[in-house]
């Protein structure tokens, strides 16, 4: 920004006068009203904050329930866990929980197979024995004992 001396500022002063019908008091009141409006807006303005990286979902609350500890007359403490909810029959015995039978289908991942022929699911499921090289067995050969 350019700095001016007092003489230069007096030379740059406008030579014409303010209009006769200009109301200075109304102009000052309007400036005060705008300044007050800006102060109120700044009071309620939330400044730009860094966005949080964990706003995608609510973090699950993992709370392990403590077991209930009961003390006997002899001073022995035993802990009892909360029993799971199982349907109880007429005789008071819990009925066995039924497990739904599901069939498991293996879907081959053809994009990692170099052949143009699609993979057979029987080949994927079957585990084939592999021959592996044992380095320690190779080091312990009978030829070294002869020397």
Swiss-Prot record:
InterPro entries: Caf20 (IPR031456). It comes from the Eukaryota. Residues 46-68 have a biased composition (Basic residues). One of its GO terms (cellular component) is cytoplasm. Keywords: Cytoplasm, Initiation factor, Phosphoprotein, Protein biosynthesis, Protein synthesis inhibitor, Translation regulation. One of its GO terms (molecular function) is translation initiation factor activity. One of its GO terms (biological process) is positive regulation of cytoplasmic mRNA processing body assembly. Residues 46-76 are annotated as: Disordered. The keyword Phosphoprotein applies. The keyword Cytoplasm applies. It is found in: Cytoplasm. Acts as an inhibitor of cap-dependent translation. Competes with eIF4G1 and EAP1 for binding to eIF4E and interferes with the formation of the eIF4F complex, inhibiting translation and stabilizing mRNA. Belongs to the CAF20 family. This is Cap-associated protein CAF20.
């Amino acid at each position: 920004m350019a700095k001016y001396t007092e003489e230069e500022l007096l030379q740059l002063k406008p030579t014409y006068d303010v209009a006769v019908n200009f109301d200075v008091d109304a102009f000052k009141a309007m400036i005060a009203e705008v300044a007050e409006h800006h102060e109120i807006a700044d009071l309620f303005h939330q400044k730009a904050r860094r966005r949080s990286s964990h706003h995608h979902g609510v973090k699950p609350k993992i709370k392990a329930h403590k077991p209930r500890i009961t003390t006997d007359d002899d001073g022995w403490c035993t802990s009892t866990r909360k029993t799971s909810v199982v349907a109880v029959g007429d005789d008071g015995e819990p009925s066995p929980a039924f497990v739904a039978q599901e069939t498991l289908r293996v879907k081959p991942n053809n994009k990692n197979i170099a052949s143009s022929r699609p993979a057979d699911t029987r080949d994927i499921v079957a585990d084939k024995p592999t021959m592996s090289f044992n380095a320690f067995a190779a080091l312990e050969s009978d030829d070294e004992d002869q020397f």
